[in-house]
Amino acid sequence: MSNDDHGPMIDIDKLIHEPARLMIMAQLYVVEEADFIFLMRQTGLTWGNLSSHMSKLEEAEYIEVRKEFLDKKPHTILKLTQKGRDAFTEYRRNIDQVFKDLPD
């Protein structure tokens, strides 16, 4: 592969590619929305780690974070935005292409 022909690896979204954020994005891609505790359990991330990665995804406008009260307790809901859904779809396409381009 020449320097001019990097293929799909050059197009991999580094924000999504980080393992913790990849888990968050994958979970949210499948469900309409999820609460913070559900994502903690599904990803195995600590409160602080999930919160940190959630902030980065929110800054990129890949997720929407809604805070509400449920039985007088704070409740955080996360949802993929259309931009996030499109970015994840493109990420999957690029990763698939990387593997297809590998020799047998």
What are these regions (language model features)?
Residues E61:
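Glycine-centered, phosphate/nucleic-acid-interacting loop/turn motifs that mediate DNA/RNA or nucleotide
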Residues P8-N49, E68-D71, H75-K79:
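N-terminal helix-turn-helix DNA-binding core of bacterial DNA-binding proteins
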